[in-house]
Each structure stands twice: as C-alpha cells, then as structure tokens.
Amino acid sequence: MGQKYLFIDRDGTLIAEPPEDFQVDRLDKLALEPDVIPSLLALQKAGYTLVMITNQDGLGTDSFPQETFDPPHNLMMQILTSQGIHFEHVLICPHLPADNCTCRKPKTELVTAYLNGGLMDVANSYVIGDRQTDIQLAQNMGITGLLYQRGGLNWQAITDQLTKRNRHAHVNRVTRETAIDVNVWLDQEGGSKINTGVGFFDHMLDQIATHGGFRMNIEVKGDLYIDDHHTVEDTGLALGEALNNALGDKRGIGRFGFILPMDECLARCALDISGRPHLEYKAEFNYQRVGDLSTEMVEHFFRSLSYSMACTLHLKTKGRNDHHRVESLFKVFGRTLRQAIRVEGDTLPSSKGVL
C-alpha cells in the first residue's frame, strides 16, 4: 500500500491571499490561515505526508522578483517547521498563464514522480486548495480534491473529515459452491444483517460483531443441499479478508488482545494481528451438531478466518454444554477482536514498521 499524501496549495489555503494583487511579496502581507498549524499537525499524526504545490505567477520576473518572494515564504516555512510541520517537497510553478508551460496547475508535471510506481495511496490522498484549478489538478491526478474555504470547508473541517475513522471493506467471493457478500464497518456498531442459511451460524457470527463492537452485513448462498462445509469455510475466508482490508494500514490499532467465562464454560482467546496466519485451537464437543451447525466446522471457520485475516489466533474452551462451548468461542473472539482493532494512537504497532 502506498503512502497517503496531501498536496496543498499555498496562497489562499495555507496563508491568506492579498486581494489587491494576489502576491505575498512583503512580510506585512504574511498571515496564516486560521487553525492551519494544529490542523497540519493532526494530519501528519494521522499518517499523511505533506507536499506544497503552488502557482506563483511571474516569479523571478520584474513583476514578481525572487528577492521579494523569498522573505515572506522563508518566514512561513520557518514558522511551520518550528511547530513540527514538515513538507516533503515545495513545488512551485513560476510561469504566467500566457507562458503555456507544462508545470502550471492543473497540469501534473510537478507531481509526475508521485504518479508512478505505486508510491501514492490513491484512495487516501488529496489535493487541498482554494481554486477550481486545485480541484482540476486532483482530477488529473486521479485523487480527491478538497476546495478550501475559510467560511466553509476550513482547516478544522478538513481535519475532521480526513482523520475521522471510517474503516470499511467489502468482499464479494463467488465460487462454484458459494456466493458470499460481506461488508464490514469497524467504526460503526449495531444493525448487523447476517444470512448464511445456517441459523445457528448466523447467531454465532452476530456474536462476533456484537462483542467486537462493529457492524457487518453477510449474505451467503451456498450448497447447503450437500452440507454446511463450503458455506462455513468460505464465510470464514470472506470475513477474514474483509476484516484485514478494513484495518487498512493498521496504524494506531491495539493489535493484541482475553478470557471469557460463560456459565460453566471458560473460553480463552489470544489474538495478534500479525500478518502471519496461524491457529491453535482446542475444543471438544459431545455431539456432531449444535442446531444446524456442524461442530467440526467451528475449527474450520476459525482456521479459514485466521488465514485470510493474516492473524495469529489461539482459541480454547472448556465446559459441559455444546451450545455454550461453541458460543463462548465466538464471543471470546469478538471481545478479543474489539481490543485488537481499537485505535489507541497513530503509530504502527510493530518494531518492523509493517504488519
């Protein structure tokens, strides 16, 4: 996955644009836009890399000498740097519109390096600016544009929009045996809709969502006229993939997470969203089925899920009642998952720098 970038305009976006001549060519013309410093700090903390991109009409000519541009620009950069704000690059087009150059926004020559080689996370990178040319630049780059307005979509609103978690994933898995559609919303709770055709399995999947503190919709059409094997197995694969995708870059998650008593049962679960699939499972049942679910498929479900979710999962339960033993495994997994997916900060919980 590429890096999240913010390509930010300067005049009218980071700093106020003088209405009389649209040039910040004196120190007394320099004024930061409201809330720009705390907003940029919050956006950096959320994992965005900042790039400044600006058109400076006629820079270096008699109409806009370099020596009048540099003092306010350098002071602006010093202020931002002193507050912990870092721009990876400052990209400037010095040409006039009449020059018909190839680098003036909304043309993309200045950002060519970001458009090649998968460097940029296209789905989570943005252009922020106060003019339609900034929005057109975003369109030309294939990313989203945010039109800055001090009285509307201002820095506080932009920061709220870009840092508010909305971790969602959709997986559609179709084979000769099953057709499965899964939607997962990790930052929403309640209202899950689950229909696998296996009633007790639906109830168990709902336990994961309820105790995991998230919402999911699962719709399955499987070859139940044979048995429940493919339905349960493929649901585990699709759900694990959806959970893994919804976690995204995993920045700030707890990663690890529990022990759960349920009546006479004691269920244990240890989870590491490690990127390494592995299952250790210990549970014994008296009967082949609980309701319409084969008890042997419980282990198979968690093995499939741990494989596609790329997590290390240890599950164990003891008890006397098969219904309680099965349910305790799904509940304890949900509670453990709640801990592991909870956002606790902004750093990646790995000394390797990758999960």
UniProtKB/Swiss-Prot annotation:
Its cofactor is Mg(2+); Zn(2+). Residues 167-355 are annotated as: Imidazoleglycerol-phosphate dehydratase. Mg(2+) binds at D9, D11, D130. The keyword Metal-binding applies. Its EC number is 3.1.3.15, 4.2.1.19. The active site is at D9, D11. InterPro entries: HAD-like_sf, HAD-SF_hydro_IIIA, HAD_sf, His_synth_bifunc_HisB, HisB_N, Histidinol-phos, IGPD_sf, ImidazoleglycerolP_deHydtase. Pathway: Amino-acid biosynthesis; L-histidine biosynthesis; L-histidine from 5-phospho-alpha-D-ribose 1-diphosphate: step 6/9; Amino-acid biosynthesis; L-histidine biosynthesis; L-histidine from 5-phospho-alpha-D-ribose 1-diphosphate: step 8/9. One of its GO terms (molecular function) is imidazoleglycerol-phosphate dehydratase activity. Zn(2+) binds at C93, H95, C101, C103. Keywords: Amino-acid biosynthesis, Cytoplasm, Histidine biosynthesis, Hydrolase, Lyase, Magnesium, Metal-binding, Multifunctional enzyme, Zinc. Residues 1-166 are annotated as: Histidinol-phosphatase. In the N-terminal section; belongs to the histidinol-phosphatase family. In the C-terminal section; belongs to the imidazoleglycerol-phosphate dehydratase family. It comes from the Bacteria. One of its GO terms (biological process) is L-histidine biosynthetic process. This is Histidine biosynthesis bifunctional protein HisB. GO terms for cellular component: cytoplasm. The lineage of its organism: Bacteria, Pseudomonadati, Pseudomonadota, Gammaproteobacteria, Enterobacterales. It catalyses: D-erythro-1-(imidazol-4-yl)glycerol 3-phosphate = 3-(imidazol-4-yl)-2-oxopropyl phosphate + H2O; L-histidinol phosphate + H2O = L-histidinol + phosphate. It comes from Pectobacterium atrosepticum (strain SCRI 1043 / ATCC BAA-672) (Erwinia carotovora subsp. atroseptica). It is found in: Cytoplasm.
